[in-house]
Regions:
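Bacterial N-terminal signal peptides that target proteins for export
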Residues: 1-9
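Hydrophobic helical h-region of N-terminal Sec-dependent signal peptides
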Residues: 10-15
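Acidic, Ser/Thr/Pro
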Residues: 22-166
Length: 166
């Protein structure tokens, strides 16, 4: 009988040890997709970009940033240029160029390399601007408003008001 008792105890111990050694299958690795992240959306808001009167000799650049997750940012604004002061007459003598550039285009512009612009107005002294910018995806995007004086001999005064609606 002692042998049966030892055998029963050994069998019981093996069952306890065997039950304790069972492993659960490993959990699958979590894959995080960037679109799973929730971030505040700028939809329904506006951002003032530029409201200024300045003297334009050769060119002037104004940077602004579109926040992440802006699906259809819309640039709206006005500019008027004058050959003398901001309250003078605005005619062909006050014509300037206006460009909207992304960072790559701006780097080309600054480096005097040929490049395209997202939006261009040439030879204008009074212009309304309504332009839909590309969506910003998951990162903020920087843009530049560039005012250029094709007549480098005579300075011009430029009045601007620009905003972005999301």
């Amino acid at each position: 009988m002692p042998q049966h008792r030892h055998l029963a105890m050994l069998l019981g111990a093996l069952l306890v040890v065997g039950a304790g050694c069972t492993q659960e299958p490993p959990k699958p690795a979590s894959t995080i997709v960037p679109s799973d992240h929730v971030a505040p959306s700028p939809v329904g808001t506006s951002q003032n970009v530029l409201e200024k009167t300045f003297t334009l000799k050769k060119s002037a650049e104004f940077a602004f940033e579109i926040p992440a997750h802006a699906v259809q940012p819309q640039l709206h604004g006005l500019f008027a240029s004058f050959p003398g002061d901001a309250h003078g007459t605005s005619d062909a003598n006050a014509d300037i160029d206006f460009l909207v550039l992304n960072e790559e285009q701006h780097a080309d512009f600054v480096g005097n390399r040929p490049s395209e612009a997202l939006f261009t107005v040439e030879d204008s002294n009074n212009q309304a601007v309504n332009f839909i910018l590309p969506a910003s995806q998951s990162q903020p995007v920087k843009y530049y408003l560039v005012f250029r004086n094709p007549d480098n001999k005579h300075s011009k005064v430029v009045k601007t008001t620009f905003r972005v609606d999301f």
